[in-house]
Structures are given as structure tokens and as C-alpha cells.
Amino acid sequence: MVLIRVLANLLILQLSYAQKSSELVVGGDECNINEHRSLVLVYSDGIQCGGTLINQEWMLTAAHCDGKKMKLQFGLHSKKVPNKDKQTRVPKEKFFCLSSKNNKEWDKDIMLIRLNRPVNNSKHIAPLSLPSKPPSQDTVCNIMGWGTISPTEETYPDVPHCANINILDHAVCRAIYPGLLEKSRVLCAGILEGGKDTCGGDSGGPLICNGEIQGLLSVGGDPCAQPHVPALYIKVFDYTEWIQSIITGNTAATCPP
């Protein structure tokens, strides 16, 4: 079963992306407290997601993480004992691809958020660069988030977990996800042997390759971390022109077809 990996209090909110749920990092370890400065914890109408700061006033997450009441936390590591430089913001503006709100296309699950006021760079807060080129097959990339660390139980950690996974051939995911087009603007990533994966509560979180934000978690298997069931990540490189156009003031910019 394919699930969008989102945590809604103590239950998984199932959305219309072929009934996917949000996810957390399974098979990883606690992230180094100083090595996830761009990671954002997103609370949206009771749902937990991840996100990525791309400059002091803008961030990215998945479109299916949208909600009427959103709280965005920066510089967070432990939820119970927050860093002194933790900052909280809310959205000022939100931008979507035209079709993403209809939940009909695999590759339009992206939301660009302008913060109500800029965050200040600090020891635990800094933006991540947009990609200069797409990642090649077999590139080792990093996933991270506060999602569940068990593929079968709701075991949510106090701190974010990180793991390394690989960029896989697009054909691997096409064989798993019905309706995924050959030219969909997504990345297929995971560990074919299983054991490491994003999972419930990680939706919208980053796929980081060579120090750049290459993907946003959108869709994965249920249960998480199964052999031969990688996840789908929105291919950020294909949206860089749209993102940069909006940030520079062209709010009427359209997403790539």
C-alpha cells in the first residue's frame, strides 16, 4: 500500500495521493545537533511534516502538508529541551503548482512558503542551497526528520534521525507506483535491501545530496523501509526557476508542465 507520510496526533492522516501517509526516518541514527541547520519542523492542523529553509525568508515543504494553522520551527533538535536559538514563524504567503491542490499529479507536491518575518542565521539555523544540477543515479543522499523510527509502530523520537540512501533508477519506482509517468518530476530514492527509509511524520522533509536540497519527501511504502519499495521525492531541480522567480517578485510564475 502506498502512503503519504504524515503524522496527525496519534493517527496517520490519509490523503488522496493513492492513500499515502507521511513518514519518519527508519534505520537511521540521531542527527548531529549541528548538522541540520536548514531542517524545519512543520505543524499543520495537527499534522507533523518536515521542511527546508532555502533563505532567511523562504522555505520548501510538500503541498500535502498545507493547513489553515501552520507553525514552523527553526533551529530545533530536541522537542523537550529546545535549543536557545530556536525560532518560530508562520506563513505569510504560500505558493503551489496549479494542480497540486487537486492531489492528482505525482510530481506537483511542492509548496513554497514565505515566512511572516525572516529568521536569523545562528549556530543551529542556516539555509540550504538550491540544486545546481540534478543528482545522478547511485548518488548517496541524506534524509532526516522527526518521523517515526519504527516501520510498524508509531514510535516518534524527541530528536531528528538521519540516514543515507541512494538515488535509484526511475524505472524502479515506475514498477511500484501505478500511474507514475516516465518523465515525472520526481526522484526515486531508497535502499533496495530495505531497512532505511523515511516514514510517518517526515513528509515534505529534505533529500540532501552533496550539500544541496535535491528532493522533498512525497510518497512512500507502508510499512516503511520494505525491500524494493523506495520512496518518491519531488525533484527540486526542476522547480528552481519557478522558486527563484517567485522569490524575486514574480508571484505569477508558473510551474513547469
From Swiss-Prot:
One of its GO terms (cellular component) is secretory granule. Residues 19-24 form a propeptide. The keyword Glycoprotein applies. Glycans are attached at N120. Its EC number is 3.4.21.-. Expressed by the venom gland. Its main location: secreted. It holds the Pfam family Trypsin. Monomer. This is Snake venom serine proteinase 11.
